[in-house]
Amino acid sequence: MLAAAAAARRHWQGRQRCVVLDTDFQQGQSFIQLWRAFREDREDREDRQDRNDLENDKNAARCERLHVVAMLPTALKQEDLICTARPADDAPYGELLVNAWPNLTPGFHSLSFDEDSVQLLLCNGPVGRQLSELVARVDVFFVHGHLLSDSALADPSRLAKALAKVFARLAAEGAVVIAKDEAASVAGDVALALRKALSDQGFVIEPNTADVTNTSTNNNTITARFVPRFQPKRAPARLHAQLSSARHAVIVGAGLAGSSAAWALAVQGWTSTVFERHSSAAQEGSGNAGGIFHGVIHAQDGLHARFNRAASIEAAKAVRHAIAHDGVAGAADGLLRLETELSPFAMQAVLEGCSLTPNYAKAISAAEASKLSGLRLKHAAWHYAEGGWVEPAGLVRSYLARAGSRSTLRTNSVVTSLQRSDGGWQLLNAEGDLLEEAEVVVLANADDAARLLSTLAPQALAALQQVRGQLSQMPSHTPGLPNSHLPLTGAGYLLPSWKGQTLFGATSNEGDTDSAVRLRDHANNLAQLAKLTQIPAVAELTSNGFQGRTAWRCVAPDRLPVIGGVPLKTQALIDQPRLMARYPGLFVYTALGSRGITWSALGGQTLAAWVTGSPSPIEACLLDAVDPARFTARRVRGLQRNQASGKVAAV
């Protein structure tokens, strides 16, 4: 890995960001060497800066961010990392890595070190599948020779062609590929196949490995640089160009979406200005007294389940930080979701079929669920180990606090309209006065985003719905009111008692515009709570001492958020979201529905990747699933089906 570290060091000189892809994380040795080299380089530059030694150095600007994308063919447990022997100089890095190690589930996992200057994206699963789902612009590729020489894998020639094709898709300008086998030479048919495949995809082999006919060489390293004969065609939605020379974004909305976007952009080194129409942040859907977060388990493990799983893992980290550092009310030590159809045995089979470990979720009996909750439950349950609850407004404040000086909140600022300008985008108030002009704008203002886009992209958010919800709150000592040790959900939800109050709910009424807290909705919430806890008498409790709150959820028909670049109003009949052209510098992050707490952290990170060009924290198929262009793509596919059947429909 020293060769890759040296190549990366050369590549990150004078750059804002360097992205390294490692085809096998192993026990983290390669990552730690890169991390150590990056930190030492930064410290050396700071020392030289203090001595004014960098005055004439054209690469004086230090690299701000090192991104390492590492394939993890086999899930690695924390104890495996602990037992890994490391040189003394690497031990401190190993300890930090162990402490940050996630409970691995299939898919991508993001870790951050050294005040976000070193970011690690772990891709857990078969290498070929994970590479095909990766969205990034890679500067340095490190290929472990055993990936090609392992006889258990496919034919080396076929695999080399597949790898080279993926590398060409991911390669940034001037990217370098380094293939090295630590145990033996990358030679013979394997070397020949890899060199030829790379050459065919626009990589130029370095002179020391240029002889593709000499299979007897003892050189065990192949080095190639990406110099394509023609510019490869990129999917417009995946261009990931930095559109702001100032690396600054204007965000409209200071709820869970807007605040998490500000935090995630700050992690990538960007600044932001957040416009909020109210006098403070989190005054609408994010202003409830409490809410839950957890994953989703489906036997098919489809896009909805996978996105929710990835999001819940990031949510747990965000909530723990908010509790520990910002004094926010909440807990991330478990949640119970009742299962009324499957037996614990069948539930366990689902978990095993999805390769999910107890660290993520367990199937437990009614007796076990009763013990954990303190209630007499009659159904089995999914125990989400990292699920929990939190005060949403507190989480919003935590996101903004983490963005720190990189983000400015402007309250009592109502954005009435949005228009294009030579400088990018102009935000105007009701009088037509200019509030701000920016190259990058993020609309994170729930359904109001659709209004701002009504002229630019009238169909982009037309499918969004407004759903009224009312939650109920009662004194915890109310006779007959159940109290649970853990958050309980299923038909409705029940939060643990907090400061003498118990929160439960909630109603769901599409198209209801009444803002009043209604007694009949309290009654509905009690009936729902009675069904959840299987205590019929709960439904008969009186409304004395009731408190409540109404808010509106912005919901997409497919019950997934909307995150990404805004598609152009008019374009060809394209049926794939990733191929649709976008308005430059205009993004949307909305439709968090009732899962704002669960989705906000990962949603913010996904939005930041769109804006800044950093590696996407989720797979390409999940990007498609939350892409604003998905609604247009579906209409196009519907039109194509109608045309095929002789019908006519409008897009």
Where on the chain are the PLM-derived regions?
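S-adenosyl-L-methionine
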Residues: 82-133
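C-terminal substrate-binding/active-site "lid" region of AdoMet-derived donor-dependent transferases
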Residues: 151-228
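Short beta-strand to alpha-helix junction loop
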Residues: 178-180, 300-311, 340-344, 382-401, ...
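Active-site substrate-recognition segment that forms the wall
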Residues: 230-244, 250-252, 256-268, 277-278, ...
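Dinucleotide-binding Rossmann-like beta1-alpha1 core, especially the glycine-rich loop
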Residues: 291-372
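Helix-loop-beta segment of a Rossmann-like dinucleotide-binding subdomain
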Residues: 299-302, 327-337, 360, 366-401, ...
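Helical element adjacent to the flavin cofactor pocket in flavoenzyme catalytic cores
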Residues: 382-431, 435-436, 444, 448-450
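C-terminal catalytic lobe of FAD-dependent flavoproteins
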Residues: 538-651
